A protein has these predicted regions:
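Short, charged, low-complexity patches
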Residues: 98, 234, 354-363
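Beta-lactam-recognizing serine transpeptidase/beta-lactamase-like catalytic domain environment
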Residues: 1-51, 56-346, 394-395
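Short, gly/Ser/Thr-rich active-site loops of penicillin-recognizing serine hydrolases
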Residues: 263-270, 361-395
């Protein structure tokens, strides 16, 4: 988190790069394409961030003048018209602090804050130039733009907001309007009701698809809807929280070294941007996230972990996917929380909850980094020589 250096990065499915030596056969190449192993989920995969995105919503609320230290209602659901927005497993927690809302990942607290910010920005009458606090804050964290890692083909992701809604409408309006007029004749032959549904939907999108609606704002607040990010973007965002507000460009390369061992160019840390948030907001996030691991949704995978010696700041996420019965599992973290050094993010598609699926692997990585065996911390057992990332270069 101090310089943006990437110590390790992995993606699955994977393959042996040695397959390219001497040329790859058509059969081998076809197998690689079919397995999707040629692309990296870490830098190219785009996934709804779920509740890991609530750090963005929290910062946006603070920017809009909402107290980070007040209590907020956490009912089991909020109803807008015929649509019900629920907490995970429909749990209700009553009146709780915002820090506690992060710990237990209370959706309805963030729905409420998003709703107020949406109304303050003009609601349905807002223009494309109206304030969009959550989206604006997300861009500060580095979402919606490439991280700048020294690898080709990185995805920029997408930040849901009023700007994206207008751009999407401008790109799809003609198609929506044409479908609204034609009424889906082919579909109508076999399923008239489905054709009616599609037609009604396209009529609405044709006329008003540019509007950033209340439901859009609520979904965006919990990392659902149109927002998609890469795991690397998430790691850099949490690194920025950990280091006090600096968004680094991630780097895999430490230096360019000649065949004789001469260092041609040593790569220095590169700052992409800053969070540009009040120190009090960053402090609130840094003070709150360790509670997720000790008393919240990230507690289970760290039971028995020496958190008194190596405190871990974290946020879980379970992002729902359209047409998929199993959510995307996220666990975003950094440690030690009191003196941040490393940020670790794990995402598993169709993995269920962040705590259940991704969290245990995050724990194992921290155990390897810090030389942890049970509750004992021994830097000499670290996978890193002397317990520190190497500053020297292989020659």
């Amino acid at each position: 988190v101090r310089n943006g250096h990437v110590l390790a990065m992995a993606s699955y499915p994977t393959y042996d790069p040695g397959i390219w030596v001497g040329g790859v056969t058509p059969k081998q190449y076809k197998s690689l394409i079919k397995s999707d192993s040629l692309s990296s989920n870490a830098t190219q995969g785009l996934f709804a961030p779920g509740s890991t995105y609530k750090v963005v919503s929290t910062a946006a609320a603070g920017e809009q003048g909402y107290s980070l230290y007040s209590d907020y209602k956490c009912p089991k659901n909020i109803k807008l018209g015929t649509q019900v927005f629920r907490n995970y497993e429909s749990a209700a927690y009553g009146q709780i602090s915002l820090a506690r809302a992060l710990e237990v990942s209370c959706n309805t607290v963030f729905y409420g804050l998003a709703d107020r910010m949406w109304e303050s920005a003009g609601g349905n009458d807002a223009t494309r130039d109206s304030a969009d606090p959550i989206a604006d804050t997300a861009f500060r964290f580095g979402f919606g733009t490439r991280t700048g890692i020294d690898l080709p083909g990185e995805s920029a992701g997408r930040v849901a907001g009023r700007g994206f809604k207008v751009q999407n409408w401008e790109a799809k309006r003609d198609t929506w309007c044409e479908n609204a007029i034609s009424g889906y004749p082919d579909t109508r032959k076999t399923d008239p009701k489905l054709a009616d549904y599609f037609t009604a939907l396209d009529k609405e999108n044709c006329a008003d698809g540019f509007r950033w609606r209340e439901g859009d704002a609520l979904n965006a607040a919990i990392g659902q809807g149109d927002t998609v990010v890469t795991p690397l973007q998430m790691a850099m965002a949490y690194s920025a929280i950990a280091n006090g507000g600096t968004v680094y460009e991630p780097r895999l390369i430490k230096a360019v070294v000649g065949s004789d061992g001469t260092v041609i160019n040593r790569i220095k840390p590169s700052v992409k941007s800053t969070l540009d948030l009040p120190k009090s907001t960053i402090k609130f996030l840094k003070d709150s996230l360790p509670g997720v691991t000790t008393d919240g949704s990230g507690k289970t995978p760290f039971l028995g972990f020496p958190l008194n010696q190596i405190p871990v700041a974290s946020k879980t996420g379970s992002a729902q996917v359209t047409g998929d019965n199993v959510s995307t599992s996220w666990f975003a973290s950094y440690a030690p929380a009191n003196k941040p050094r490393y940020a670790i993010v794990i995402m598993v598609t169709q993995g269920g909850t962040g705590s259940q699926t991704s969290g245990p692997s995050v724990r194992k990585i921290y155990e390897s980094l810090f030389g942890i065996n049970g509750k004992n911390v021994n830097p000499n057992r670290s996978v890193l020589v002397d317990g520190e990332p190497s500053k020297s270069l292989p020659v």
